[in-house]
Amino acid sequence: MSPLAWKIRLSLGVKGLTWQSVQTPMSLPKPDHFELTGGYRRVPVLQVGADIYCDTHLIIRVLDRLHPSPPLSPPGQETVEHAVSRWAETSFMMVILSFFGIGGIFAEDFVEDRQKTMIPPGTDLEGASRIVGSKLIQIRNNIERLEGMLEDGRSFLLGDTVSAADLSAYQGGPAQYIDEQLRQEFVIRNRPGARCAPG
């Protein structure tokens, strides 16, 4: 599932809203999705009645407007919330998602689709999967940044209540899929004999 779709699911839960979802294909073609969105290919998409909202940040604003309590973008902290969310959805999320290249988690058609639209030409995907050590350091650095924001004892990144910044920083959606691979990587790094283990 898309990490941004995961964020919107969490947002709906924080607000205590009843909702339904549909799964769309990860790669083209997406005929039902395109018909709904007028050609917009990304997820998530929010439908409220006859209105369709694309873009995660817009969806958060719409949810806050339609259901103000609790606010996902706290009044007076909108700029900070947006900055932290943007950081979490780029720097932090991208390093987590880089692990998806390890072990062929994604279907070949998905990788081909993303190579056409998101990955710069000439990117060595196989080589990228060999730089696990540096990616683990980046993950640790990002987690330390988050911990630094919480050093003063606050419960959440922007204060005492959960915000969209927290939901963006929570990487449980994508991380649950790479957890086993990360564990395996640590085993291989710490116990070279594990590489030769039968089975």
Label each PLM-derived region with a short phrase.
Residues 88-195:
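GST-like fold's C-terminal all-alpha helical module
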Residues 1-115:
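GST-like domain detector, emphasizing the conserved glutathione-binding G-site
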